[in-house]
Each structure stands twice: as C-alpha cells, then as structure tokens.
Amino acid sequence: MADSGPASFWTRANAILRKNLTYQKRNIWSNVRLIMIPFYLCIVLVFIQALFDSQVNNSLDNQCGCQCIDKLGDGKCQMTCGLEYSTRDQGFFCAIPKPQPWPPLILIPRPEYRALDANFTNDSCRRKNSCPVTILFTGNNHSLGAVLSRNLLRRPFAMNSSDLLFSLANNVLATTFKGSATNYLDAGIVSDGSIYNIQPRCPPNSNFSISIGQSPLNFTKDMRCVQGLNLWRNNSIEVNLELFEGYHKGNSDGMINEIVAAYDLFDTNMTNFNVNIWFNATYKDEARNQPYKVVRVPRLVNWVSNAYLQYLQGPRTKMLFEFVKEMPKPETKLRLDIASLIGPIFFTWVILLLLPVILNSLVYEKQQRLRIIMKMHGLGDGPYWIISYAYFLALSTFYIIFLMIFGSVIGLKFFLLNDFSLQFSFYFVYINLQISIAFLLSSAFSKVETASVAAYLYVFGSGLLGMFLFQFLLEGLSFPRRWIFVMELYPGFSLYRGLYEFSQNAYQGNLNGKDGMKWKYFSDNAIDEVFYIIIVEWFVALIATYYIDKMSSSGKDLLFFLKNQNPFKISHSLQKQVSAISVEMEKLDVIHESEKVAQLMLESSTSHAIVCDKLRKVYPGRDGNPPKKAVRVLSLAVPSGECFGMLGPNGAGKTSFINMMTGLVKPTSGAAFVQGLDICKDMDRVYTSMGVCPQHDLLWETLTGREHLLFYGRLKNLKGVDLNQAVEESLRSVNLFHGGVADKPAGKYSGGMKRRLSVAISLIGNPKVVYMDEPSTGLDPASRKNLWTVIKNAKRHTAIILTTHSMEEAEFLCDRLGIFVDGRLQCIGNPKELKGRYGGSYVLTMTTSSEHEKDVEMLVQEVSPNVKKIYHIAGTQKFEIPKDEVRISEVFQVVEKAKSNFKVFAWGLADTTLEDVFIKVARTAQAFNVFS
C-alpha cells in the first residue's frame, strides 16, 4: 500500500535516479564508446605528431648545421656543428655561448614602396631608386617639432675603424629586411641586401663597403646613403589618414606609399617629453602560428630621444644606442607539438561533441512524451532537472578526465606542460555551462533530428569560426580588445579562447624548455577573463532554463509580462460568449449534471474526485481561419468509485478535455477540481494522485516491465515490501508475470503486452483519479476481457475517466456514459438509461429476393404505421418499429405471414444497441449544429 500523502522531493528524486541508473546500465556500451572518443582522437594526434616529427622536427633543415672538418690535419675529419656551418634557418638551433652584438637598425620601406605624392616628390625617383624615406611629425608646438626634426638628421656620417660599433652608433642605420624571431642573427646584416645610412642629403661618393661582426660571423656589407625627409602634419588625424592611404587597400589606385615612422609630440616642451610613435606592427605576426618577430622600434625611440636631448643640451649631447645582443643559448632542436598548434580547434570539437549527446537525450524524452508522462505520475520538475543535470555532469566529468589522462599518457604537451588542476577547473566550469545551454536549447526543439543537426552545426561551426575568424582578430593588434570580450560572450568562442591560451603556453613552453600555464600566472593571461564569463553565463543559462520551463508548464507566453490586456475587451468578449451559450439547447440530463456541479461548487465536500464547471477550450485561429472551439461548455462531476466513459466521433473534443485534465493545455475558461485541487493552480499536487494510460504507449525500450512499475511505484510513494508486492500484483493482474515476461525489455513486447503494461502503470499505487484513452486497443478478446476485469476491480476507490470507440468496452466498464459531439455533452447517463431513452424501438431485419421488397415493406407497415426503414440494399432491409406500438408476438406473426407468401432467406429482431444510440445522438447533434 502507498504511504499516506504524496511522495517527498527526495523520494521522487530517488525514483528517477534509480530509473536512470538502470537505463544507463542497459546502455553501458554506448556510454563506454562515448568516453572512449577522446582516446581515439588522441591516438590520431599521436600518429599526426609522429608523421610531423619524421618530416619536420627531425629534418636537417631544422637542426644546427654541421660539416666534417679535418682539425688535426691528419686527413681524418670530425663532424663539427656551429653557426659558421649553418644556413640562416639552421642558425636558430645552434649553441651560441657568446652571441654577436649587432648595430641597431631602423626598418625602412623598399625603394619601390617609399611614400610618394605631390607633397613629397615626383614619381621619377622610383625609377631611379632615389626616393627619400619619410618621417612625419605632429604635435601642439610646431616650432619645437621643427627643431627636433632637424636634430634627427643633422649629424654627418662618421666612421672609426678602431671601435666599429661605437662609430656606427653615431649614425642612423637602416635596412629593408624585417626582423627575425631573435637577434642571434640579424636578417638585415646576414642577408645580401645593403645597409642604409639616413642623411639629410646624400653627398657624392657616399656609398662604400664595411665589415660587420666577428669571426666566424663576419659580413661585408654595402653601406648606402638614403635621404631622410621630415614633414610636419597639423594633427594626428592627418597622420592616421596618410598612413591608411599609404596601405594598398586604403586608396582607389592600389598604390603603396610606406612611411618609416611618425611622431606625435603632444605637449612636449623644455620640462616635459611626451611622444607617441607610429610604426608598422603588422610585421610582428604576419606568419600565423609562428613566434613573434622582432620589430625594430628601440632605435626609433632612441632616435627621437637624442633629438630632444640635443634640443635641451646642445648638439654635442648624445645617448648612444650601440648594439642589440641576445642572451647565450644552448643548442636546441625544433620541438613543434601538433597538439599545441592545432589544439584550440581540435579540442574545441572534442569538448563540444558532448553537446549533441546531451541535447538529443533531452529532446528524445520530450519528443517521445516520456517526460510529460513521468510528470503526470507525480515526478516534479525539480527532481527531474536535478537528477538529469547530475547525470550529465558525471558523464561529462568522466569524459574530461579520460581526455586529460589519455592526452597525458600518450605524451601530448598540451596536457603535460599546463597545470592539471587549472585545466580541469576550466573544463569543469565549461561543461557546466554546456549542460545548462543544452537544457536551455531543449525547450526550442521538438524533434531529435532537428536538434541533432543544429547541435552539430554549432559544434563544427564554433571550431571553424574560432580558428579562422576569432583567432585572426585575437592575434591582430589593431582589433579593439573590447570587441574580443564581446565575442567571448559566445560560449563557443570562450571555450576556444581558453584552449588557445593553453595551447600558446604549451607551445612556448615546449619550444623554450619551460612549463606552460600555471595558477601563479592566472591573472597574466586572458584565462581569468574567460573563467568569469563562463561562470556568469552558466548561472544566466540556468535561470533562463528555469524561467522558460516554468512558463511552458503554466502555458503562459514567455513575454506575458509585456502584454497589456484590456479588461473591458475581455469582459465584453465573455459577455458575448455567455449570451451565445444561453440560446443553445441543452438536454435535461445535461442540465441536471450542470446543476449538480453548481451545487458541488458551493460545498466543501470532496466526495466527488473530479468536478468540472463550465470548462471551455478555444484554440486561436491561424492562417486566417476562425478560432476552434474544441470544448464549448462542459460541466461534469465524477465521484470516487465511478468509471465515466466518454464517447464521441473524432474531433468531438474528447482529447482536448483529457489534455486539460492532465495539464497538457490550460482551459480557456471555467474551472476543474481534482480531489479539491484546482488544475490551473495546483497541477503539481494533482499529479501526485493521478494515473494516466495514454492512447500511445510511452515506454523505455530498454527497461523491463518490472522496472517500469518499480519506477512509477516509487513515484507513488511505495517503498520496500509494499512496492515489491504492488509490482508483483500488477504484473499478475495484466498477465505479464509468468514465463519471465516481466524481466524482458519493453522493446521486445508485442503491442498488446505494451498496452497491458501501460494500464498497469496507470493503476499502480492506487491513484485517486485515472484517465484512460482507449485502454484495450490492439488486444485479443481474451486479453481484453482480462484487462476489463482489472480496470473494474481498480475503480472501487478510484475515479476513472475513459475514452473508447468500443461500445462493448463502454457497456462493460462504465457506470455512466457521456456522448460528446462538437465540444459539448449531448447526453449523460448509465448505458441502460441511454438505451431506454434513445432506443425505444425494435430493429427488424429481413432478407428476401429483390422482387419481394415492396411486399415486406407493406407487411411491416400493417403492424405499425410509424415504422421507419433505416437500411436497404440488395433485398436486405432494416426497419425501426416503435416499442409502444407493437408487441413482439405481432412481429413474429408478420414474419410467419411473409414466409407463407414468399421465400425469406434470413430475418432477425433486435433491441436497440449502445452503438445505435451513439449514432442516433451524434447524427441528431450534428444535424442541429449544421442547421443552427
């Protein structure tokens, strides 16, 4: 027996937890395959890494250059490695115990790209390679700017071979070659290009050769003079416009007019030095997934600083920038880790693959109506969401842990170099956000196929957009950081950003032999920003999911609080409806039922389990169609212990009535009470005492019949011995106990067995109210009779509302019947009363040859002048004879008389059946509706 009162929150949570654990046990291999996905993907990375190592990392081009040298002069050579034996690319990997000092160089445009317009010079200089290099000035003090611009280029070229670097530091040297990743070898010096000396004017014979560097890194370079041209601009806007128009996409002609640098002196004066420098930052990261290159900015800073010092102290004051020099380094090897290079997009896909799994599971229960049937049997929203969330969180956590373990075991630097606890914390908060998003999205989908397509588009779209759009903008220095923050509000990009930071730290750590990201550097990376975004979005998604679910359950529009309804308009509309109702004709029995309901509404008694008072349901019109009145005005009272049957043609409104009573839709007007509880306000409490047998079986294919009943029994607060006893009795009563049928998966049941299980589910726990929609559909005669007995026994302490198309079923089970046509009760009473009221005639059937049809009709009319022929085809005729005008013996006499005059093949006399009553009432009601 059930405990007194409904099941508690934790009892219901325990019920669904046990059901889910059993369900997952049946699907254990699906879960194993899901958790093994990271392993398979990590193995793919291992093979890619091995291929990359053989072709790239271990290539001779990516190692320090070596030659076989005869050091002892004995004809035997020894393999010797060093910078002197290396190409420019190989030199990066060589040991450099004493790095070379190199003179600092300024980056200037190549001759064919130097700035050219009417303010500078004509285009003939490009043909002669003699265009000057341009430096722009602006600021608040034009005269000060003129002095500083002159000081930049006032020094004549001077050389002192005894101290070459000191001598070169007195000059302004430049190159057209961009910087490398390091300064171990300066590309401007080791290349074949010339070194340029920027002068105010280039005198004759100003080009010569010079030797730079120490053996073995000694290079002879051509020193060429290039004219420097300083130009003043009124403000920074003009400078920005000029720089932009010098870009080949910044002007309509596609011309390139590059400027060396630009200086904004702001409010610089004798006591304040404040300067802003424009330089071309695109050279820093023009090669994606490569280390940043050195940008030649320090010499630009030193250049203008010297000009300012000379403005203050005179031309002899100098602050020399003699050289740039790297720190010593050991020999290294190329150690490019594929997992770190492609980690952001790869692991974005790996982690996001959980989203379709979660979303499909939620939408499947929604599509198959499993969630609503659980709710109808007492499972509240709270236990459902908490247990579902906990399950998906556990599954996702195992998935992430296995991903980290597999990645570490096979040696992926992405996992080994970054702090494990930091990684897990990031993944953990994100999978919580992902589960919340899946819950939120599940409200937008009703079909698994649609949800699956949308989810996979999100997965792969997020990875591709992250790599080709978000990462491009992230690495571009010109893109505003605030817009990066806005983009990170998209969950796919916040995940990508976190993985990008992990990959960059692992890549740099592996390249330099250091660790990756650690907690102590948490605030130094954007990872802290991403953490905060994910946590906030996690809670926002949970709140939004709760709100949408509550609004959907209550039937309210999501934006109901924005809608302002006109009370006068509503009351006027109701007045019109009431006046329309008042002129409709109602039968006396229906009026008596309405009066009984009105009396019950005034009383506080709960003797009647179900009370419906003027219940209406109108569906709004769509596509220009008028509103559909599914249930017009329904007043009904069903006491406990009664089975009330609803008969009616398709579209009569029976299903809409059941949907209102089970909470699927809200009534348009009127009221309904179950055990004294209002279905519009207390539906969650109503569910705890309700059982439902839907028209279509809503079962889990992998759960057994016993497991179904155990789950629903727990929802009805059955425990221990009472639970097991109730389950066993239910299985026996519907003939699902013997032969091991109870422990077979429901997916292997026949249609009839599933139907019997659905009836058993609706009756377990002795619910106070049960709704059954065609419970015996698809059953063989023996099973049908057995099931009817079960239902009849169950109604002793239960109010049952049953819909059926079987008149035999209705007559056997129902204490009272109501015939429903066009949304309205046409009659109500027990089967005998209805047959007596609407069936006051006998039906005589007689089959003869066609030529005797008129003779038969004349003989029957002799018995009663009010006889009515209701059927006629190929010699077979049916006549309806009023009972009050004829005796049965008189009918027999007519038959005997007919037999004596002609051959009668067959005949029969029957009382009116319930089916005849149903047809008669339905036709009369439909005819009246058409007429009205």
Swiss-Prot record:
Domain of life: Eukaryota
Residue ranges of the TM segments: 34-54, 338-358, 392-412, 424-444, 453-473, 483-500, 526-546
Residues in ABC transporter domain copies: 610-847
Coiled coil: none
GO molecular function terms noted in the UniProt entry: ABC-type transporter activity; ATP binding; ATP hydrolysis activity
UniProt cross-references to InterPro entries, sorted A to Z: AAA+_ATPase (IPR003593), ABC2_TM (IPR013525), ABC_transporter-like_ATP-bd (IPR003439), ABC_transporter-like_CS (IPR017871), ABCA (IPR026082), P-loop_NTPase (IPR027417)
Location of the protein in the cell: Membrane
Binding residue positions for ATP: 648-655
Pfam families: ABC2_membrane_3, ABC_tran, ABCA12_C
Classification via PROSITE patterns: ABC_TRANSPORTER_1, ABC_TRANSPORTER_2
Protein topology in the membrane: Multi-pass membrane protein
CDD domains on file: ABC_subfamily_A
Keyword Lyase carried by entry: no
GO cellular component terms, A-Z: membrane
Matching SUPFAM superfamilies: P-loop containing nucleoside triphosphate hydrolases
Keyword annotations of the record: ATP-binding, Membrane, Nucleotide-binding, Transmembrane, Transmembrane helix, Transport
Family per record: Belongs to the ABC transporter superfamily. ABCA family. CPR flippase (TC 3.A.1.211) subfamily.
Name this polypeptide is given: ABC transporter A family member 3
